[in-house]
Amino acid sequence: MSRAYLADNDKGWAKKKGADSHATPRPHKQTKMNKLKEIDTDQFLVPPVNAFKLDLDGDIRRGGNKKSERVSGFSGR
């Protein structure tokens, strides 16, 4: 430790180091991730026609014998 450091710090407290000692909040530097997007809620009042055609089961295969496709592949001995 230098003598100048001890003279400036006469109460013996540890001097703050790093960005916390001089940082000021800068909201104009915020990233897009921190900003909240405004959501247009009017678009959800009337659902589109495609919303009623969604497969809620998650099937991407249409038609055929779906039960045979879901079997793990092991058919026994």
Curated annotation (Swiss-Prot):
Basic and acidic residues: compositionally biased ranges: 8-20, 56-70
UniProt region (Disordered), positions on chain: 1-34, 56-77
Bias kind Basic residues: ranges: 25-34
Protein's name according to its UniProt entry: Uncharacterized protein DDB_G0280919
The species this protein was found in: Dictyostelium discoideum
